[in-house]
């Protein structure tokens, strides 16, 4: 229904009608902004009813159908499929998907597609002024073979031996392998800014993560850039806010404790963090001292929260182990040590990726952890702060808000953001939301990793400078 006050009201699609062979009319029962309409519902895939209805007798039958013979919105159709070994695409001579010019600008796109078969499209998006380049869509090959490998090592060994031309890998190539493969004759390389982030989450449902001064103090003492530049040799890019640096218009000015503590020495960071705790009502039997330089601080003793609470002993910071991700593993060791220098008993615990996910994303476990490190891959339209921090998305209720962040002002801005009809309006609201997150610190955002990729020089891409790499685009 459309009555938002009704007990059984659910925001969503009210009706969906196929008007003709190329047009679908969608009616919504809510005021949808960019995030719900243009970047979600309007981009949903459609399945051909004539073909798929024969399998729609039950969920099990539908999932069991291979789909190899299904009509596709592509210039290619499935040809051969060898389970666990390879499959091939062949050019479909009856396709309507070929040709057409696409012109890319700094902040906009123009498409002129009219091949005499498909419905003609002439559209422009964003700012279509300034420098640009144009490419004509193919396909330019008749067959594409996808060879399946059991792991990345086997895939890149096949690449090195010339058996494959490109490896589809959303994580890209690790730096040492990238450097090794770049020296192989006939190999081209590309490096792109990633559309993601690695982060540390505080559980704001339980003490001490429930205390804002504690979260701010940890954020202040954590000299991420020291670790990234001096220990990890610059292989990752420091990230303070929710927006990757490539999304230049969306990146908000850094404010709050991260701005206050930027550029401070280790001694100054420690002193500032102690001041934050004291201003927040924390007490200690002895506040300790810092000898200066790179030496560790003499940690405070007898630290208690504003209401006399004693922080738990043996708190764990879960992070992927060095074998899975040496960057987060290393960062976790430093941040746990910095928390120890503030008088908190915290240990970095290397933990399997899936174990961390089960621990922090399961509703029944939502209060059974203190800190963890993981990462997110993000979408083209950056509406992720709503998913990660809106109170109605709390993981205790099955959502992605693992910290349990609950802030009425933030929620109100989320409501406005969800209705934003223009990118400019959405950016302004997003940056207001970011300012709250800089103050409240449910996440300590850590860094972003460039996407490194390699391909054989017999493959030609229209462009290789693309957000998050070639694998996640039409280039891959």
Model-derived features: positions:
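Surface-exposed binding/hinge segments that line
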Residues: 2-56, 69-82, 466
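Short helices/loops that flank or line small-molecule/ion binding pockets
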Residues: 153-164, 212-213, 333-342, 355-369
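Append "and occasionally in soluble cytosolic enzymes with long acidic Gly/Pro-rich linkers
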Residues: 85-90, 96-99, 112, 118-133, ...
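Aromatic- and charge-enriched surface segment that lines or borders ligand/interaction sites
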Residues: 1-2, 25-27, 208-210, 215-217
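Second-shell loop/turn segments in exported
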Residues: 12-14, 77, 143-148, 201-207, ...
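Short, well-ordered beta-strand elements
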Residues: 24-26, 74-76, 87, 141-147, ...
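Extracellular/periplasmic solute-recognition and catalytic clefts
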Residues: 2-6, 15-16, 79-88, 130-134, ...
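Detector for C-terminal structural segments
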Residues: 82-87, 93, 191, 198, ...
């Amino acid at each position: 229904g459309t009555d938002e006050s009704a007990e059984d009201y659910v925001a969503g699609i009210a009706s969906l009608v196929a008007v003709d062979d190329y047009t679908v009319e969608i009616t919504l029962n809510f005021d949808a902004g960019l995030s719900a309409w243009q970047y979600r519902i309007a981009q949903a895939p459609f399945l051909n009813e004539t073909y798929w209805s024969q399998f729609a007798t039950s969920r099990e039958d539908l999932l069991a159908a291979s789909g190899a013979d299904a009509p596709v919105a592509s210039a290619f159709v499935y040809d051969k499929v060898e389970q666990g070994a390879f499959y091939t695409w062949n050019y479909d001579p009856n396709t309507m998907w070929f040709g057409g010019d696409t012109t890319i600008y700094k902040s906009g796109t123009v498409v002129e597609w009219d091949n005499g078969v498909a419905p003609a499209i002439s559209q422009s998006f964003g700012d279509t002024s300034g420098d640009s380049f144009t490419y004509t869509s193919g396909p330019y090959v008749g067959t594409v073979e996808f060879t399946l490998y059991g792991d990345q090592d086997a895939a890149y060994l096949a690449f090195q031996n010339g058996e494959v031309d490109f490896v589809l890998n959303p994580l890209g190539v690790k730096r040492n392998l990238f450097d090794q493969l770049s020296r192989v004759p006939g190999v081209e390389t590309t490096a792109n800014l990633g559309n993601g982030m690695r982060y540390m989450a505080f559980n704001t449902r339980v003490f001490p993560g429930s205390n804002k001064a504690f979260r701010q103090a940890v954020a202040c003492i954590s000299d991420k850039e020291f670790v990234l530049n001096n220990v990890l040799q610059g292989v990752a890019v420091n990230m303070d806010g929710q927006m990757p640096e490539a999304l230049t218009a969306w990146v908000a000015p850094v404010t709050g404790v991260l701005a206050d503590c930027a550029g401070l020495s280790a001694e100054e960071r420690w002193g500032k963090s102690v001041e934050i705790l004291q201003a927040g009502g924390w007490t200690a039997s002895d506040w300790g001292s810092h000898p200066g330089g790179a030496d560790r601080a003499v940690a405070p003793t007898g630290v208690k929260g504003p209401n006399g609470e004693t922080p738990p002993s043996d708190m764990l910071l879960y992070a992927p182990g060095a074998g899975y991700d040496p960057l987060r593993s290393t960062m976790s060791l430093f941040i746990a040590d910095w928390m120890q220098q503030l008088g908190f008993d915290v240990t970095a615990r290397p933990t399997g990726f899936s174990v961390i996910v089960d621990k922090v994303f399961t509703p029944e476990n939502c209060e059974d952890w203190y800190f963890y490190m993981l990462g997110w891959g993000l979408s083209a339209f950056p509406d992720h702060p709503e998913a990660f921090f809106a109170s109605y998305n709390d993981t205790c209720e099955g959502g992605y808000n693992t910290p349990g962040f609950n802030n009425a002002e933030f929620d109100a801005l989320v409501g406005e953001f969800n209705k934003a009809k223009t990118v400019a309006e959405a950016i302004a609201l997003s940056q207001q939301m970011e300012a709250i997150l800089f103050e409240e610190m449910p996440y300590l955002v850590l860094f972003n990793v460039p996407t490194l990729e390699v391909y054989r020089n017999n493959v030609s891409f229209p462009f290789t400078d693309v957000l998050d790499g070639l694998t996640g685009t039409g280039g891959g």
